[in-house]
């Protein structure tokens, strides 16, 4: 029943309203509005079925119902009131106009929804601190600060541009400068400028909703930067010994004030300016050349190393190695060069390559491996010299003993035996031994041992020693026995035998006697010929007429014996005249004899000799005897053949010799002129002459003796 009554009531109500007319209502209500400061704001309002009073309120304050809104000079209402149009206009809009506005139909009790009026204030052009030209130092971090001041609404956004390109926002940040003043903001751009940033343009733009295009402020960077250096070398690849020119170029703000050159960190003395000329060597490969350029801001340097081609240079030489027999040995050496050298190992004096590389290994060495090993480096480029270094391998082994040649010795004279010892390690002792004894050092009876270093060592066998065994007063047994020289060290013992050779005195004495006899004979022949010729020239007339004898008697005491040739005598008248010479030591006395005077005043003893000189006597009698007999036995060659020399004597009319030469008074007349060579005082057996082979028979008659 109740459900049926409700629709009926609604129908009746609708019919009643239709007869009374439409009620007042809003055809258009104001909406929120954003207006730039200084522009016009329009808030629309339209009512339907209302012909009463319409007014606007500002944040609840009624502005009035008249169209021109008295008291609000910048406000007015426009539109056809009959049509219900009541729009509110504000021009120019100011910041104080920002409020909430409502359109009200007072008599109908209608109020529109509130409309918020927002007044936008465009930002002013920002300011960059230090602009329009900002001076910075290249390489030093710096900040660019941009500020926007004023009552800009909303708060502006500050953006940075470089050469028209927006920079990343991560490089700057924005700060509100004053609370309640949204327009006062600041933006800081952090950057590290470089030399290429000199003259660059940076733009700070303040942008907001009030001014979407924003306002810009531009600045220019003026950079001070240390020198930027470029170092070049010409040529860059050279051979050792060639010239190289380094050129150091730099750009700087402010200008360059100085250059400094260095090589391997050490200053190059005398180098100034941007150009350096050098002669390349191997050190330029590992020691770069650097150029440092300075100005008021700072300094910068660049360095470069040359590609120097050079031959091998020894960096680590091989060290001597000493090992025992059977152990391994190794050598190592290091070379450098450009290009890298080829390293090989050989043995000194050999051509066989034992190995290559920096290390040579010799397994289980023996004594034959001892010696000098050569580490040789060959240049990797033709035209470059190689190099070599040596090291000695010493193989520790038992001593090596060698008997040295010893000179033969005379019986009962001194003798010496020597041996050479090489050993590594050095021998503990060197011992001489023979049948009945041994001696290491010092003396023992007739034996004396001396040991001293050898002048040279044999490669790889260790230092050398020479041990000498001296024997005084040799005996027959010394020439038949063996002498042993032995040496020992911690690895063993070595030895060698030496024997003593015997030397015969006779051949030497014979040679000396022959030479002395020949020399004496030659001198006497020359003297006789000279005397003959001289007398012949002085008394040729007298001697040609007379054939008397010139007789030289013995000494005044009459002790001299006369030979058969002296028995022929004559009267004083038969002998002819007495001849006196100025250059002879023979004086003819009144008795017809020649007296001998000592020309040496007694320094040499001249024994008296009686010689009969028969002038013109036929050969074969008196002074002229048969040719001398040889000094040796028949069938053996004589020491000196007198005949060839005496045959060369020119003929002398004084002697009228038919044989053509002067003979000796006795076959051994010249033996007394032989003077044996002294060989030292040997021990002689009792009753034995010192040199039995030099004791010649004494002639049976006196001989003329003098000193040669």
UniProtKB/Swiss-Prot annotation:
GO BP terms in the entry: cell adhesion; cell-cell adhesion
Phosphotyrosine found at: 603-604, 661
Residues annotated with Phosphoserine modification: 571
Gene3D superfamilies the UniProt entry points to: Immunoglobulins
Keywords in alphabetical order: Cell membrane, Disulfide bond, Glycoprotein, Immunoglobulin domain, Membrane, Phosphoprotein, Repeat, Signal, Transmembrane, Transmembrane helix
Region described as Disordered: 545-601, 684-708
Residues on Extracellular side: 21-510
A Pfam short name: C2-set_2
The keyword Transmembrane appears for this protein: yes
Disulfide bonds: 45-103, 146-204, 248-291, 333-375, 419-485
Membrane topology of the entry: Single-pass type I membrane protein
GO cellular component, one term: plasma membrane
Residue ranges, compositional bias (Basic and acidic residues): 569-586
TM annotation in the entry: 511-531
Comp. bias (Low complexity): 553-562
Subcellular location: Cell membrane
Similarity field: Belongs to the immunoglobulin superfamily.
Function: May regulate basal insulin secretion.
Subunit and partners: Homodimer. Interacts with NPHS2/podocin (via the C-terminus). Interacts with NPHS1 (via the Ig-like domains). Interacts with FYN.
Protein name, UniProt field: Kin of IRRE-like protein 2
């Amino acid at each position: 029943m109740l459900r049926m009554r409700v629709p009926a009531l609604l129908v009746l109500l609708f019919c009643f309203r239709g007869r009374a007319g439409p009620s007042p209502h809003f055809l258009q209500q104001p909406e929120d509005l954003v207006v730039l400061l200084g522009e016009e704001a329009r808030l629309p309002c339209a009512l339907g079925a209302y012909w009463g009073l319409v007014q606007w309120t500002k944040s609840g304050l009624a502005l009035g119902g008249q169209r021109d809104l008295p008291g609000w000079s910048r406000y007015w209402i426009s539109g056809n009131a009959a049509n219900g149009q009541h729009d509110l206009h504000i021009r120019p809009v100011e910041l104080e106009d920002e409020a909430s506005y409502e359109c009200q139909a007072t008599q109908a009790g209608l109020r529109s929804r509130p409309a918020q009026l927002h007044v936008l204030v465009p930002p002013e052009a920002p300011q960059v601190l230090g602009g329009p030209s900002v001076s910075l130092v290249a390489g030093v971090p710096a900040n660019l600060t941009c500020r926007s001041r004023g009552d800009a609404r909303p708060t502006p956004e500050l953006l940075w541009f470089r050469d028209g390109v927006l920079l990343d926002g991560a490089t700057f940040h924005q700060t509100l400068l004053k609370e309640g003043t949204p327009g006062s903001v600041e933006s800081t751009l952090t950057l590290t400028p470089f030399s290429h940033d000199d003259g660059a343009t940076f733009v700070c733009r303040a942008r907001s909703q009030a001014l979407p295009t924003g306002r810009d402020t531009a600045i220019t960077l003026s950079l001070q930067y240390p020198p930027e250096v470029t170092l070049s070398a010409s040529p860059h690849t050279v051979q050792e010994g060639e010239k190289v020119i380094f050129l150091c170029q730099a750009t700087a703000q402010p200008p360059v004030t100085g250059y400094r050159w260095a090589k391997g960190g050490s200053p190059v003395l005398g180098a100034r300016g941007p150009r350096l000329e050098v002669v390349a060597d191997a050190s330029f490969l590992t020691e770069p050349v650097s150029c440092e350029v300075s100005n008021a801001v700072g300094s910068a340097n660049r360095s470069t190393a040359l590609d120097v081609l050079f031959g091998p240079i020894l960096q680590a030489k091989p060290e001597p190695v000493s090992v025992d027999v059977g152990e391994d040995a190794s050598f190592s050496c290091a070379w450098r060069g450009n290009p890298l050298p080829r390293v090989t190992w050989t043995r000194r004096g050999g051509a066989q390559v034992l190995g290559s590389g920096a290390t040579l290994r010799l397994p289980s060495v023996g004594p034959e491996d001892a010696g000098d090993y050569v580490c040789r480096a060959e240049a990797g480029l033709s035209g470059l010299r190689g190099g070599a270094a040596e090291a000695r391998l010493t193989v520790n082994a038992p001593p090596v003993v060698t008997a040295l040649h010893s000179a033969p010795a005379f019986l009962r004279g001194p003798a010496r035996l020597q041996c050479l010892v090489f050993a590594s390690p050095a021998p503990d002792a060197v011992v001489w031994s023979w049948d009945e004894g041994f001696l290491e050092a010092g003396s023992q009876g007739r034996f004396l041992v001396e040991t001293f270093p050898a002048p040279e060592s044999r490669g790889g066998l260790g230092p050398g020693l020479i041990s000498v065994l001296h024997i005084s007063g040799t005996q027959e047994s010394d020439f038949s026995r063996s002498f042993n020289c032995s040496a020992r060290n911690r690895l063993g013992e070595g030895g060698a035998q030496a024997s003593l050779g015997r030397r015969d005195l006779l051949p030497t004495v014979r040679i000396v006697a022959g030479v002395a006899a020949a020399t004496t004979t030659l001198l006497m022949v020359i003297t006789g010929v000279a005397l003959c010729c001289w007398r012949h020239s002085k008394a040729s007339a007298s001697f040609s007429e007379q054939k008397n004898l010139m007789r030289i008697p013995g000494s005044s005491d009459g002790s001299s014996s006369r030979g058969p040739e002296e028995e022929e005598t004559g009267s004083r008248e038969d002998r002819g005249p007495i001849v006196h010479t100025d250059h002879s030591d023979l004086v003819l006395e009144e008795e017809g004899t020649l007296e001998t005077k000592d020309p040496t005043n007694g320094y040499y003893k001249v024994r008296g000799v009686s010689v009969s000189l028969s002038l013109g006597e036929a050969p074969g009698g008196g002074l002229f005897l048969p040719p001398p007999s040889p000094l040796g036995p028949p069938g053996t060659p004589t020491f000196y053949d007198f005949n060839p020399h005496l045959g060369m004597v020119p003929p002398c009319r004084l002697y009228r010799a038919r044989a053509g030469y002067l003979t000796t008074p006795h076959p051994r007349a010249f033996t007394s002129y032989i003077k044996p060579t002294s060989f030292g005082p040997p021990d002689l057996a009792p009753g034995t002459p010192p040199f039995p082979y030099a004791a010649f028979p004494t002639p049976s008659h006196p001989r003329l003796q003098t000193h040669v």
